[in-house]
């Protein structure tokens, strides 16, 4: 019996030493989850279910939170804190969702992603545009015309800046472009090799509560504003993020492009979500390593 107790004691000591050694060997790696937990969450937005629910389904330990009519999923992805926001469609909805997310979750950064229509004939369905710039293409001053003078949208070529540096200026005529955050762009480039369904390019995302189907008008936006794609949320998100000084990047996938007969493909919504999650992971990984 004494021999049995002796051997049990020896085994217990060996086990303790072995586990201690394992913990010691993994010490450099054990700090990673701690650093991940210390990070503020990154918010990834999508306007519609087809642009948000795929991401939400991939979160671990997700909880759903409703603030007014805006839906948020809070959880982790690859160990990093992530909030998925369904902003709903349009400039006002996305601006409100962004302000709520910033106030409620204090995010480290915001990615606005989803589908878009092409303005650049060289881009095709499933190509992804990284918003080096994001701009509001729905703010402009029309020319003066008398009753009976008609209306021609191709003459609406004076952009109106709704966020002027000089608020005393009664007519701030300028194209306001919000620049994509450089660290988020770097993360997007790190994720680029994993995306194989199309190109990933930098460009300008144009936003407005308008669905443009006039090819001459689209060509004008592409020429004057330099737009690659159009959609209905990113510029308002960029504007709110800018005022709260939160890093921002717009990521848009071409779901259709009438400039080159690119037909709508509903699978683009999920493809962009997968890429956006990859970008978020790369960004959070870099932030954790920098701590």
Residues covered by each model-derived region:
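Proline-aspartate-enriched helix->loop->beta-strand connector
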Residues: 106-108
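C-terminal motif of bacterial Sec signal peptides marking the signal peptidase cleavage site
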Residues: 18-21
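A C-terminal functional module that forms or caps the active site or interfaces directly
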Residues: 208-250, 259
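N-terminal short beta-loop-beta anion/metal-coordinating cradle
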Residues: 33-99
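Mid-sequence, gly/pro-rich, charge-dense loop/helix-turn segments that line enzyme active sites
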Residues: 120-218, 222
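Bacterial signal peptide processing site
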Residues: 23-25
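Bacterial N-terminal signal peptides that target proteins for export
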Residues: 1-10
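His/Asp/Glu-rich mid-to-C-terminal helical/loop segments that flank catalytic regions of hydrolases
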Residues: 258-291
């Amino acid at each position: 019996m004494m021999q049995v107790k002796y051997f049990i004691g020896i085994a217990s000591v060996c086990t303790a030493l072995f586990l201690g050694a394992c913990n010691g060997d993994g010490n450099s790696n054990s700090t990673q989850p701690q650093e991940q937990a210390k990070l503020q969450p990154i918010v990834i937005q999508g306007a519609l279910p087809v642009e948000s629910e795929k991401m939400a389904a991939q979160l671990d330990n997700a909880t759903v939170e409703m603030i007014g009519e805006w839906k948020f999923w809070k959880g982790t992805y690859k160990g990093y804190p992530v909030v998925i926001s369904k902003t709903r469609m349009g400039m006002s909805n996305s601006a409100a969702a962004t302000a709520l997310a910033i106030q409620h979750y204090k995010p480290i950064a915001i990615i606005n992603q989803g589908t878009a229509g092409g303005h650049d004939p060289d881009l095709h369905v499933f190509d992804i545009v990284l918003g080096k710039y994001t701009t509001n293409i729905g703010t402009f001053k029309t020319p003066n015309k008398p009753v009976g003078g008609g209306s021609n949208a191709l003459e609406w070529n004076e952009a109106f800046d709704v966020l002027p540096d000089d608020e005393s200026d009664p007519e701030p005529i300028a194209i306001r472009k919000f620049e994509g955050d450089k660290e988020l762009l770097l993360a997007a480039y790190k994720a680029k090799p994993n995306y194989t369904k199309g190109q990933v390019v930098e460009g300008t995302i144009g936003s407005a509560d308008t669905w443009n189907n006039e090819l001459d008008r689209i060509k004008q936006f592409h020429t004057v504003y330099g737009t690659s794609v159009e959609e209905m949320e990113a510029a308002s998100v960029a504007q709110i993020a800018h005022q709260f000084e939160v890093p921002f990047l717009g990521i848009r996938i071409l779901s259709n492009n009438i400039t080159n007969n690119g037909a709508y493909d509903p699978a683009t919504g999920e493809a962009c979500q997968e890429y956006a999650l990859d970008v978020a992971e790369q960004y959070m990984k870099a932030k954790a390593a920098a701590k």
